[in-house]
């Protein structure tokens, strides 16, 4: 099972090295510094235990593993995720800034994995399966917000983001879509069952006020982003169709995430039906020895 987790093409250890190589020698896009570690099986198993039941001694072991694996600096600010899941929608647990928080990054990472497990549980409506099907834990450089933008999701700056859909077999840009799509965002904050939650009320107002300038920024820059994404594709050594997320901060454009295209939101809106080719996945690792 552990080796099957290694087979997930969406895991960052699969696509990030190829993206870094494709961006070498180019100056338009930046990529945050990233450290990826394979979590021990015993650590992954802890996410199946109620987080509140874990003892201080257990959490201390997890923290010491993280300090050794990621070579953390107490005065740095970090963005945390598993190989496939960051839960930016609970940003206070994805972004650590204070020295005491950095010392507890192992706990934060374990909590992220536990959140992913809970999303597939019977108390989660709707239930979401497989968001953290990975054995990777990831610590990334945090990209500071240089424009003091309003925040949603308990601390996430509402910066302009772009979701590009690309075909790595044909080196073709299939489409581009605003990550913070107004129809999706307004529906999320106003129509979901938790819309009366104070955080959601805050986010509904914040997004509505930011929406006009956010969409103007997107429309003014999307062609520029698309042109530079197209320039990456000949050197991007991946197979199949992918989504590629870009975040703007001032004059900087950051390549921040990838996923198989058909698993990604806005796939049907951005990719023409005749161009869609879902990825063929292989989850069976090659085993050594005689058969």
Predicted feature locations:
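Generic hydrophobic/packing signal
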Residues: 88-93, 243, 259, 263
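C-terminal active-site "lid" helix and adjoining low-complexity regulatory extension at the edge
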Residues: 216-223, 227, 234-240, 248-291
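Active-site nucleotide/adenylate-binding loops and adjacent lid/helix of ATP-dependent enzymes
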Residues: 1-161, 165-230
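Conserved protein-kinase catalytic-loop segment immediately C-terminal to the catalytic Asp
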Residues: 165, 245-248
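Active-site flanking residues adjacent to catalytic metal/cofactor-binding acidic residues
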Residues: 80, 244, 256
């Amino acid at each position: 099972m552990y080796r099957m987790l290694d087979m997930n093409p969406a895991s960052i250890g699969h696509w990030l090295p190829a993206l870094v190589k494709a961006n070498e020698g180019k100056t338009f896009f930046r990529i945050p510094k990233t450290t990826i570690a394979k979590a021990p099986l015993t650590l992954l198993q802890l996410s199946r235990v109620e987080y509140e039941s874990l003892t201080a001694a257990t959490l201390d072991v997890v923290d010491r593993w993280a300090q050794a694996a990621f070579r953390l600096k107490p005065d740095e600010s970090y963005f945390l995720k598993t190989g496939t899941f960051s839960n930016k929608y609970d940003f206070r647990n994805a972004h650590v800034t204070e020295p005491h928080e950095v010392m507890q990054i192992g706990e934060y990472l374990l909590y992220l994995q536990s959140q992913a497990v809970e999303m597939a549980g019977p108390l989660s409506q709707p239930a979401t399966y497989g968001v953290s099907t990975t054995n990777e834990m990831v610590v990334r450089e945090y990209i500071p917000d240089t424009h003091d933008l309003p925040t949603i999701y308990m601390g996430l700056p509402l910066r302009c983001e772009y979701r590009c859909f690309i075909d790595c077999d044909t080196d073709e840009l299939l489409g581009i879509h605003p990550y913070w799509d107004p129809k999706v965002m307004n529906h999320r904050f106003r129509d979901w069952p938790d819309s009366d939650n104070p955080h959601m009320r805050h986010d509904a107002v914040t997004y509505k006020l930011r929406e006009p300038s956010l969409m103007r920024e997107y429309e003014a820059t999307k062609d520029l982003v698309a042109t530079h994404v197209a320039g990456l594709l000949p050197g991007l050594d991946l197979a199949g169709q992918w989504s590629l997320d870009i975040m703007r901060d001032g004059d900087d454009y950051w390549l921040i995430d990838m996923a198989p295209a058909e698993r990604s939101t806005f796939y049907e809106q951005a990719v023409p039906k005749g161009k869609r080719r879902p990825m063929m996945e292989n989850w069976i690792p090659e085993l050594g020895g005689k058969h």
